[in-house]
């Protein structure tokens, strides 16, 4: 069986091959997992190759939204989110799922119930985080992105779709929230005020899971769900979708940390 992660500049940088290879070995499953750099204009071509040769694949930046148009079906959650990070190939049909949303909900959902949540970003990861916050019962959600128009469009779309209080704020704007989620690739700057927050959630794990925002959270005594935690949880859910197994998350996390040299 063949699996992959596709995106921009993932070869040699994504920990997913190491993580899933270690997991497959521990489960006694004969499978290969590779990283494939796929330019946007070749996404359709890869989809046709995957349809005939792969059992499943993961999708990362910048294809989580674009890949949807090449799939045969979506899970209910992926359809609501408008983004896919996990694809199951079965009988030459490709079905999209969103295990990012599952991971955020599982690891942070308890903190988001009745809370004010700030989401940084407006791409595929932000969509997943936004859905998880809504599912958890967040009291109010703020969306903040460097391109203000994208934040406004995302907030409006989800506000109308789910009838929840969701507000876009300027990138330079300051707002304090109970839970802050970084769904951007920014790792080398403090991009939000964590004063008074109870939880910080970080999607970034490379070049290091100790991003500037993680360091700021630790300095302030804010609980952290880091990029490694999210990667492992979404990956475990992906394996459950692909193979119907319950993988050992400790094995997966150990492989990720070894890949990162930690």
From Swiss-Prot:
Protein name (record): Shikimate dehydrogenase (NADP(+))
Superkingdom of origin: Archaea
An annotated Gene Ontology molecular function: shikimate 3-dehydrogenase (NADP+) activity
Keyword NADP recorded: yes
Function: Involved in the biosynthesis of the chorismate, which leads to the biosynthesis of aromatic amino acids. Catalyzes the reversible NADPH linked reduction of 3-dehydroshikimate (DHSA) to yield shikimate (SA).
Subunit structure, as described in the record: Homodimer.
Species annotation: Pyrobaculum aerophilum (strain ATCC 51768 / DSM 7523 / JCM 9630 / CIP 104966 / NBRC 100827 / IM2)
GO biological process: amino acid biosynthetic process; aromatic amino acid family biosynthetic process; chorismate biosynthetic process; shikimate metabolic process
Gene for this chain: aroE
Pathway connected to this protein: Metabolic intermediate biosynthesis; chorismate biosynthesis; chorismate from D-erythrose 4-phosphate and phosphoenolpyruvate: step 4/7
